[in-house]
């Protein structure tokens, strides 16, 4: 009996010591730096912007990408990185936010951005000559306190001035990594204070001679991996066909790192060419999973009313009836404990002196 009491005493002491350690870690490194994976605990009162994908908003645990944070989106070529970020831009603009696009790759398709719902007339765009210029412009925009979202496309295209002015065969190891490390040290605090969301798009490279583990790595050194609150790995996993014609990609996004909610969740959605993420398709799939949309054979119904035979027809019905689509989406969000639509508008930013 005494042994049991002693064991309980030790256990209580351990719990007390653990609570003190967790409190110290949170005080030193910030809220959300450590959490129980099974709890599903998330940082409270966090302002977010939707990604344009219901499944990804749910996988992120807070209903979207967190404001006042650095986010990295990376993946192979043509996997949907720019499409996803342009959808985030469109969502931020719907909330009345001001967005900037730092086009270091000099490859932004304005017409395509318009098709995804981006208000291109009010989108700030910069096509810098060097990596230093791109990051100085980013710093100036963040410090202004008037920008809600900045996209840098891409880290690989942030070429240091010394490399541009040098000869083609010059060896300049670690130059870009040092540039990124310095910029992020400077930017992070300001980003938090001004409540600006900064998204870095990144490319994948292969490490030579890797025998075990993944040979893939992202460009620009390790600094971004540390400073990013959210890291998303986006991949194309299949094609969507209409007859013999390929009309889109099946896409998977894995939340590789998440400081505001438990990580490692995945989201699957369709990206349709010329339209972007198929929001209606996701609403149908997640609505069926949450038993909000009924599926009997090939027919889909909502509130006892048939909305289409086959997914394509149901998708078309929701496209023609956006109010019903919003209603179903909000019910799905509510069922899964995620913030409903149009409740994620940010507070006014703080202007840097």
Curated annotation (Swiss-Prot):
Binding site for ATP: 75-82
Domain of life: Bacteria
Cell location: Cytoplasm
GO cellular component, one term: cytosol
PROSITE patterns in the cross-refs: RECA_1 (PS00321), RECA_2 (PS50162), RECA_3 (PS50163)
InterPro entries recorded: AAA+_ATPase (IPR003593), DNA_recomb/repair_RecA (IPR013765), DNA_recomb/repair_RecA_CS (IPR020584), P-loop_NTPase (IPR027417), RecA-like_C (IPR049261), RecA-like_N (IPR049428), RecA_ATP-bd (IPR020588), RecA_C_sf (IPR023400)
Family matches, as SMART domains: AAA
Keywords tagged on the record: ATP-binding, Cytoplasm, DNA damage, DNA recombination, DNA repair, DNA-binding, Nucleotide-binding, SOS response
GO biological process terms on file: DNA recombination; DNA repair; SOS response
Gene3D superfamilies per UniProt: P-loop containing nucleotide triphosphate hydrolases
Gene Ontology MF terms in the entry: ATP binding; ATP hydrolysis activity; ATP-dependent DNA damage sensor activity; damaged DNA binding; single-stranded DNA binding
Function text: Can catalyze the hydrolysis of ATP in the presence of single-stranded DNA, the ATP-dependent uptake of single-stranded DNA by duplex DNA, and the ATP-dependent hybridization of homologous single-stranded DNAs. It interacts with LexA causing its activation and leading to its autocatalytic cleavage.
Membership in a protein family: Belongs to the RecA family.
Protein known as: Protein RecA
Taxonomic path: Bacteria, Pseudomonadati, Pseudomonadota, Betaproteobacteria, Burkholderiales
Gene name for this UniProt entry: recA
